């Protein structure tokens, strides 16, 4: 497995006690498949994503990314692991208003130390992969909501991660644009063999997913299992 979250428990301070966000959660995510994690608000989906991204250290359990047990890594090593192996697609694209689509990607990968010309080629290749080859020199205000989210996805892939973590990518999009973004994520996951986790509360497009896991009250209530076929 490219990503393994094993028996993870995560708590937060809550007055005089602790609030359990994740309770002994185990999730294995294979390369080349898109695993959807669904559930209501407060079920633990975002906490699971934060732990998988190594942004939060769990109270107990293990997180293994690309064969590396993150509990054994220093803060600097975790930062390098995130940069090299983990791509994160946030709910809101948060693009820089002054930069073109291509520049958004190049800025994020600048710390890799690769030559600028190589970064430019990589950015253009990814924009082509997400259907925005003709938008490389456009700024965010010149792009639709769906196009901005596509830039967001391309940006997360700049460093060729083995793990892709996606947080509610369709929440601000209409049904048609949301379906197009999810189709794109499925295609990119298979073409690039990433282990992709998609967190969502939207059940409308589950038939596009490879596997689905259901969260409730900080636990995996079901899954991951092959995604159901959704009528209509």
Q: Language-model features: where?
A:
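Conserved ABC ATPase signature
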Residues: 139-143, 147-149
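Conserved ABC transporter NBD signature motif
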Residues: 61-69
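Conserved catalytic motifs of ABC-family nucleotide-binding domains
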Residues: 160
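Catalytic Walker B motif of ABC-type/P-loop ATPase nucleotide-binding domains
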Residues: 164-167
């Amino acid at each position: 497995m490219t990503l393994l979250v094993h028996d993870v428990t995560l708590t937060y301070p809550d007055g005089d006690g602790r609030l359990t966000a994740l309770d002994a959660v185990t999730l294995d995510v294979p390369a080349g498949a898109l695993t959807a994690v669904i559930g209501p608000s407060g079920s633990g989906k975002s906490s699971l994503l934060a732990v998988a991204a190594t942004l939060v250290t769990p109270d107990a359990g293990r997180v293994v990314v690309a064969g590396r047990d993150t509990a054994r890594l220093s803060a600097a090593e975790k930062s390098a692991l995130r940069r090299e192996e983990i791509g994160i697609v946030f709910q809101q694209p948060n693009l820089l208003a002054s930069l073109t689509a291509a520049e958004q990607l190049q800025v994020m990968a600048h710390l890799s130390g690769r030559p600028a010309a190589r970064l430019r080629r990589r950015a253009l290749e990814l924009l082509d992969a997400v259907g925005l080859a003709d938008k490389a020199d456009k700024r965010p205000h010149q792009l639709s909501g769906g196009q901005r989210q596509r830039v967001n996805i391309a940006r997360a892939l700049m460093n060729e991660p083995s793990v892709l973590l996606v947080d509610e990518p369709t929440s601000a999009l209409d049904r048609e644009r949301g379906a197009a973004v999810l189709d794109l994520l499925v295609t990119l996951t298979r073409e690039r063999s990433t282990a992709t986790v998609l967190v969502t509360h939207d059940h409308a497009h589950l038939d596009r997913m490879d596997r689905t896991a259901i969260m409730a009250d900080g636990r995996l209530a079901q899954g991951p299992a092959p995604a159901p076929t959704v009528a209509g």
